[in-house]
């Protein structure tokens, strides 16, 4: 079913596609299973193509694919501002079919003197990055990397164990995800 989880009864007479929720535990069991099935080997990520930002002691790690003009990425950045003791590897991934100016903005962010601060200023304060004449960026490589990893939307982030989380999450949810990974 196109890479989606399908539930069926014993003789496969009935099936459904969707989220299976454990109401007692208030957990989305489908999402948890998808995280495992779509995990990656984070040791193979080309970290030189990412903007690195360390908050606090940086003992926990997030690998984030994000588009500077994605509204959900803006929301995630607001939530990440409340998360401490984390190292963030930010892979700029402009999705130009949705956000035509995102590639230009991503290039300006990458070429900035303080990349992560410029990223935060743009997402949180709507401050346009300074125009740059030119610099070499990994943005095209990040687009190819995202395709290789089946990252088809932003934000998408990976935890230290390689498990995938698609979409924005609250600071509390991010904390729970980080605590669940040794």
Regions found by a protein language model. Give the residues of each.
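C-terminal cap of thioredoxin/glutaredoxin-like
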Residues: 1-16, 125-182
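Structural alpha/beta surface segment adjacent to cysteine/selenocysteine redox centers
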Residues: 59-135, 147-152
